């Protein structure tokens, strides 16, 4: 399991931090956790190819975690890429299919992909859920941000695990997902002196 933080920022643009996204290489798969603005370019900077992404896992629907879906779909339509692109899966909170249709609507056909190319897996938002994939399992739990927000625990076949959450306040869901995990990655959106209930600060995340 190899992990690369492509972006550790927030909705506020910063020269030194890109928006949230993490690349995980696992069991021969490339998994993207969130896809905030600039993620496709960050992949290129890191020497990774967006066309090699097998799974995109989305924590919630705010723009700083989803905006580069637009770039990703449009870039995937580039004919030399589209001809050789293998199928990929988007794993996201319940309601994602509707969200995606609304996101694509202003662009018309320019974000459309062949049906064979993309599948989606919607996870329950009001309770824990899990999905098994080739070589790993994704467990999810509701977290304290929006009604659709989820935290995740990814476990490979050897038992290694990583827990990830985008924006969240302290909640039992993330505590349980993180229990005995090998690595925990949490978004801490505010400094300690500006802490709010639905987003962690460094002290709250620690």
Model-flagged regions — what are they?
Residues 1-164, 169, 174-176:
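Binuclear metal-dependent hydrolase catalytic cores
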Residues 170-206:
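Cap/insert and terminal regions of metallo-dependent hydrolase folds
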């Amino acid at each position: 399991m190899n992990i690369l933080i492509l972006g550790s920022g927030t909705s506020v643009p910063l020269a030194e931090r890109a928006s949230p996204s993490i690349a995980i290489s696992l069991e021969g798969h490339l998994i993207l956790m969130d896809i905030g603005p600039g993620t496709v370019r960050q992949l290129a900077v890191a020497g990774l190819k967006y066309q090699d992404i097998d799974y995109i896992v989305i924590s919630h629907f705010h723009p700083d975690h989803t905006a580069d879906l637009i770039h990703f779909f449009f870039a995937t339509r580039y004919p030399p890429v589209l001809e050789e692109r293998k199928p990929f899966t988007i794993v996201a909170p319940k309601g994602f299919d509707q969200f995606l249709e609304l996101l694509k609507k202003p662009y018309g056909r320019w974000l459309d992909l062949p049906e064979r190319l993309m599948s989606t897996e919607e996870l329950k938002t009001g309770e824990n859920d899990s999905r098994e994939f080739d070589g790993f399992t994704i467990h999810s739990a509701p977290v304290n941000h929006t009604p659709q927000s989820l935290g995740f625990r990814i476990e490979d076949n050897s038992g290694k695990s990583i827990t990830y959450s985008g924006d969240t306040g302290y909640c039992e869901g993330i505590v349980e997902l993180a229990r005995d995990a090998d690595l925990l990655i949490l978004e801490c959106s505010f400094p300690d002196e500006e802490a709010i209930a639905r987003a962690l600060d460094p002290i709250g995340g620690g």
